[in-house]
Amino acid sequence: MTGSRGRQAAADGNPGNPGGPSRGAGRLRPMVPADLVDVIALEHELFPEDPWTPEMFAGEVVQPPDSRLYLIAEAEAGDGGVADSDIVSGRGAVSGLVMAGYAGLMFIPGGTQADVLTIAVRQSYWGQGIGSALLDALLSAARERGCAEVFLEVRADNPRAHGLYLRRGFAELGVRRGYYQPSGVDAIVMRKDLR
């Protein structure tokens, strides 16, 4: 992946919560290879027309930490209406936590830019601040790394995610026609100044 493959799924859309995650936001932790079964299942649920492949995720999650950051958002099972049958790997059944979402960030070589590659939140957890918490964690990591700006692409047919990015200070730069393949959906390119 080159960093231009970013897309976001209903990242939060909680207009009553512009400043940060709500009490339902759960906890964030680094993504590990053992998470990929759940991540790929959620990817196919949210992006059935153009999901990342298992190979893409497997290649991304093992990238050096100086080039990528992937996070998992966990929440208490049942907080978002997730049934036991929705827990693919069984991890949540043991820990009482379920994967509510995930996100990824690429640090551009040279150290002044980052690119949000993906943010996805399980639909039953929409509006609980999980997308906001994931985005805020990515932005914080970019600031800590000295990045001056963060870029992303968001599907033109995803007003929830687009609205979150606008509320978080991203500005539209343009449109990439037919960017998402094979669906052909346009991408809105956005940028946030971190200075």
Description of each model-found segment:
Residues 38, 163-164:
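Well-formed, non-transmembrane alpha-helical positions, independent of function
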Residues 121, 155-156:
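Short amphipathic helical patch at the helix-1/turn junction of helix-turn-helix
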Residues 151-153, 166, 171-188:
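Conserved catalytic-core motifs of GNAT/GCN5-like acyltransferases
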